[in-house]
């Protein structure tokens, strides 16, 4: 079970890198990306994931143009070469770790892509995400996030779309740990109290001089179990923005959000306000 990474002094346990430190079937190691132009008329999401205790890896790329979605999903048996991230016709090449990478999808079901990511700001390490159902940990993950620009092209059903870094931006995150994946496990005795869901807000924003990454997780009773609001400056400084107060705006009579007002506080106690508007109709 050895792989190329085992040549390097990066081990944290007395076992090969490809063996996860946990035997939990839900252990995962995954990347997520999104890309869009500033008009909001086109949106792209993509990702790749490794699930060593399930023996599989998968990837996807989805493009939304107007009201049309076109997607490709790929899956394969896992391998031990984690430096060569690929699933079928999909691959990720890391140029400069934590700064630049390239996503390529050879033509598959009418979709092809060649997209290069360049971070506009440094990555930010988020707080550890932990969630329990009864006595059991169902989510225990580490993530980092980044805002950046995209360049390259997409091809969809014969249409070539140029991705210009002057107008194409997005966010990405890397996460690894434990979270529910794949088929549902036997439930066992029902949890007491039962899991009633959670409220989740994720807002990555890129400005000219800084980026913002906001993650808030609340239980049904409003208890905030994750509060992460940071500002990442061009020079690499990372500033916490306190305990944000959030007001979600909805379409009247529905649960469809149209935007949000987020009020935070900088290190000197000055208010920092963000008005977020949905580009979806």
Residue ranges: model-predicted function:
Residues 1-281:
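Structured soluble/peripheral alpha/beta segments that form catalytic or ligand/cofactor-binding pockets
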């Amino acid at each position: 079970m050895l792989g190329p990474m085992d040549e390097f002094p990066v081990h944290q346990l007395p076992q090969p890198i490809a063996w996860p430190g946990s035997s939990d079937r839900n252990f995962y190691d995954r990347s997520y990306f999104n890309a869009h132009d500033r008009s909001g008329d086109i949106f792209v999401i993509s990702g790749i994931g490794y699930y060593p205790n399930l023996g599989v890896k998968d990837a996807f790329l989805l493009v939304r143009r107007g009201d049309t979605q076109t997607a490709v999903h790929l899956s394969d048996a896992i391998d031990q070469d984690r430096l060569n991230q690929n699933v079928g016709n999909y691959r990720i090449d890391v140029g400069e770790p934590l700064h630049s990478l390239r996503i390529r999808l050879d033509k598959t079901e009418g979709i092809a892509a060649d997209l290069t990511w360049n971070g506009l700001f440094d990555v930010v390490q988020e707080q550890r995400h932990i969630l329990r159902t009864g006595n059991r940990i169902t989510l225990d993950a580490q993530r980092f996030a980044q805002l950046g620009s995209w360049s390259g092209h997409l091809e969809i059903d014969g249409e070539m779309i140029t991705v210009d870094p002057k107008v194409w931006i997005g966010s990405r995150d890397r996460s690894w740990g434990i979270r529910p994946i794949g088929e549902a496990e036997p439930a066992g005795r029902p949890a007491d109290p039962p899991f009633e869901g959670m409220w989740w807000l994720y807002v990555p924003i890129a400005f000219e001089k800084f980026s913002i990454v906001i993650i808030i997780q609340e239980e049904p009773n409003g208890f905030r179990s994750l509060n992460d609001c940071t500002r990442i400056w061009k020079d690499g400084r990372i500033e916490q923005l306190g305990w944000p107060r959030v007001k979600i705006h909805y379409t009247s009579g529905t649960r469809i959000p149209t935007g949000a007002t987020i009020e935070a506080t900088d290190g000197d106690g000055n208010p920092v306000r963000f008005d977020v508007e949905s580009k979806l109709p």
